[in-house]
Amino acid sequence: MKTLLLTLVVVTMVCLDLGYTRRCFNQQSSQPKTTKSCPLGENSCYNKQWRDHRGSITERGCGCPKVKPGIKLRCCESEDCNN
């Protein structure tokens, strides 16, 4: 009986994927593509763009930060959606 209960618990955890975390791109500007697993509970990715003396800058990561005026922000909620 204990073995059956333990088996059911393990199968439930695998099926529900209780430890699921969102994966987002996190490379900056024109660097090679890299991804990171977001903290548990963080379900969105962002792509932030602006211009400065270096030219066009792109920042990517987990979450959906607040930005200052003049900065383009795109937030999304699917795997690797912020490229």
UniProtKB/Swiss-Prot annotation:
Top-level lineage group: Eukaryota
Predominant location category: secreted
Annotated S-S bridges: 24-45, 38-62, 64-75, 76-81
A GO term for molecular function: toxin activity
Keywords: Acetylcholine receptor inhibiting toxin, Disulfide bond, Ion channel impairing toxin, Neurotoxin, Postsynaptic neurotoxin, Secreted, Signal, Toxin
Chain's role: Binds to muscle nicotinic acetylcholine receptor (nAChR) and inhibit acetylcholine from binding to the receptor, thereby impairing neuromuscular transmission.
Protein name in the entry: Short neurotoxin NCA-02/NCA-05/UER-05
